[in-house]
From Swiss-Prot:
Family: Belongs to the RdgC family.
Main location: cytoplasm
Record gene name: rdgC
Pfam families on file: RdgC (PF04381)
Compartments, record wording: Cytoplasm, Nucleoid
Organism listed in the record: Photorhabdus laumondii subsp. laumondii (strain DSM 15139 / CIP 105565 / TT01)
Upper classification of the organism: Bacteria, Pseudomonadati, Pseudomonadota, Gammaproteobacteria, Enterobacterales
Protein name in UniProt: Recombination-associated protein RdgC
Matching InterPro entries: RdgC
Length: 303
């Protein structure tokens, strides 16, 4: 079981009936297929349990897990540039004239056509958790672009997907700043030793703190000078540690050993049972964390 390291959270903005059976049928036409000789990249759905299952959905406790795989051909631009330059110089020498831009572009296409079949591939997988009970879609992605790319694939499979990023009533950075300034956090949350502070004015500086007592005179001085906390490392219930950003994303999630060991009594040889138990455990904890964080930050913005 791959435990999520990041949470990009989206709210389904109207009642949408997502059933696992229907989803299985909808994902199937866009199953992952490897790049052909002339493809730069291909993306599609794969079973979340890998070789242990043929199903494109894993379902437990009203939660659905799906997985997208992407293959990208690696063609470093210096390699293309070097091959193109050699070709241009050769032709210009033979024809005793400078090549036009359209001719150079055509040569570049020829080079790509020649190099692509020999290019190495890079593979990546992105897990998407559909929380039907709470009407959320949560993506394990570290960047908004990667999350949006995978949402686009899901939207293509479903036909439509009415989602919006999870947004809050109050600016997150003001709440985080107050937590650091006062040292008083909502029940269940505790400050760690890492944060990022930014000046409100764009031309102002950025302070990144690591292994730092955040409730200190030094940090207080930065806050008094007009800086806001835009990223803050937090501990929740001594079960999950994470970095909360001012855009509402959770990154660098780390589950406590105590939490991860809860299912150690299940035989690891029984992959399906352990995967299922870990998925139920992870989604239960993350659902509680998300709900606690929403409440701690003052609630969601009005729909």
């Amino acid at each position: 079981m791959l435990w999520f390291k990041n949470l990009m959270i989206y709210r389904l903005n109207r009642e949408t009936s997502l059933s696992a059976d229907e989803l299985e049928k909808q994902l199937s036409p866009l199953a992952f297929t490897p790049c052909g000789s002339q493809d730069m990249a291909k993306t599609g759905w794969v079973p979340p349990m890998g070789s242990h299952s043929d199903a494109f959905t894993h379902v437990a406790n009203n939660q659905i897990l799906i997985c997208a795989r992407k293959e990208e051909k690696m063609l470093p631009s210096p390699v293309i540039k070097q091959a193109l330059q050699a070709k241009i110089e050769k032709l210009e020498g033979e024809q005793h004239r400078k090549l036009k831009k359209t001719e150079k572009d055509s040569l570049k296409d020829e080079i790509l056509h020649t190099l692509l079949p020999r290019a190495f591939s890079r593979f990546s997988q992105t897990y998407i958790w559909i929380d039907i009970a709470n009407n959320l879609i949560v993506i394990d992605a570290a960047s908004a672009k990667r999350a949006e790319d995978n949402l686009a694939l899901l939207r293509k499979s479903l036909g439509s997907l009415p989602v919006v990023p999870l947004t809050f009533k109050n600016p997150i950075e003001l709440t985080l700043t107050e937590w650091v300034r006062s040292g008083a956090l909502p029940t269940g949350f505790a400050l760690m030793d890492e944060a990022e502070l930014k000046a409100i004015l764009e031309e102002g500086g950025v302070i990144r703190c690591k292994k730092q007592d955040l409730v200190s005179d030094e940090i207080a001085t930065h806050i008094e000078a007009g800086k806001c906390v835009t990223k803050l490392a937090l501990d929740w219930e001594e079960r999950i540690q994470f970095m909360l950003s001012d855009d509402g994303t959770f990154k660098r999630i780390k589950f406590s050993d105590t939490l991860r060991e809860q299912n150690d009594d299940i035989d690891r040889e029984d992959f399906a049972q352990r995967f299922d138990a870990d998925f139920i455990l992870m989604t239960g904890e993350l659902s509680a964390l998300i709900n606690s964080t929403i409440e701690a930050l003052g609630g969601e913005a009005e729909k």
